[in-house]
């Protein structure tokens, strides 16, 4: 009986299990565009701020909405949210310098490209010429947070699904690439050193051994992040959707991808649900509710081992601290529709 009660509690239609899991360090909130990811991530951050010493909310979506949600301007540096002393927010600038990513091994005050020898400017140009620079910038911020450990828990308000999946792949891709570069450096290092002469320095005065060491340090840090992302005690992903075919299809695709990356996900927030009263004369409302119920039934059938949170379509926009706080309460206390 105790185990059955535990299962029932675990699968409660709330995000309370995330608040109760004190080991969590990384929480991703993602889904298709326009389903309420930002509102959900802001609301979850507000709830977490009641339980944790320090919370950081990061927007990795190029179309930043955190400033709009809180009615407060945020930028690339973490800033306290008005009315909170332990909740900060920031919006990563996708057009910012890729140097942040390459600087993860540099000392404070040091030119981030210095450790990369003559390849610094070349790598920067290359980075901006390839797709996925948004993901690279987001990941650079993750590396910074891993090194600083300034916040107890970090929530990511992610970009639409495709960007998010590329971002979550980024650590594995980077780790493999840097591992290969390190291997080649060790293999051809002696030959290169013989060309460089007795000083063993690159044309701009940097030492080849220092370059290899910095790349190895970066690879180790990325490996650490990769390990944390795949640890269910440290990382989880909250899927946000609406009860429509395309959103449900995108959610299923995302969950399959997350499973293939070994990233934990056990929570789904279904937004914009209609709850018309029984004798409601509105034909459109009743027809839409009927359609929503069909997809909601599919969600509950497909994800019977998930915490499925049902959120109502509200009359007003959820903007500003007060409305977000009110919305956030429904993430931990199931919404009861009026009869």
Curated annotation (Swiss-Prot):
GO terms for biological process: cellular response to oxidative stress; pheromone-dependent signal transduction involved in conjugation with cellular fusion; post-translational protein targeting to endoplasmic reticulum membrane; response to heat; response to metal ion; retrograde vesicle-mediated transport, Golgi to endoplasmic reticulum; tail-anchored membrane protein insertion into ER membrane. The keyword Iron does not apply. It is found in: Cytoplasm; Endoplasmic reticulum. Zn(2+) binds at residues 282, 285. One of its GO terms (cellular component) is GET complex. InterPro entries: Anion-transp_ATPase-like_dom (IPR025723), ATPase_ArsA/GET3 (IPR016300), ATPase_ArsA/GET3_euk (IPR027542), P-loop_NTPase (IPR027417). ATP binds at residues 32-39, 244, 271. SUPFAM superfamilies: P-loop containing nucleoside triphosphate hydrolases. It comes from the Eukaryota. The keyword Metal-binding applies. GO terms for molecular function: ATP binding; ATP hydrolysis activity; guanyl-nucleotide exchange factor activity; identical protein binding; metal ion binding; protein folding chaperone; unfolded protein binding. Its EC number is 3.6.-.-. The active site is at 61. Keywords: ATP-binding, Cytoplasm, Endoplasmic reticulum, Hydrolase, Metal-binding, Nucleotide-binding, Transport, Zinc. It is an enzyme of class 3 (hydrolase). Pfam families: ArsA_ATPase. ATPase required for the post-translational delivery of tail-anchored (TA) proteins to the endoplasmic reticulum. Recognizes and selectively binds the transmembrane domain of TA proteins in the cytosol. This complex then targets to the endoplasmic reticulum by membrane-bound receptors, where the tail-anchored protein is released for insertion. This process is regulated by ATP binding and hydrolysis. ATP binding drives the homodimer towards the closed dimer state, facilitating recognition of newly synthesized TA membrane proteins. ATP hydrolysis is required for insertion. Belongs to the arsA ATPase family. This is ATPase get3. The lineage of its organism: Eukaryota, Fungi, Dikarya, Ascomycota, Pezizomycotina.
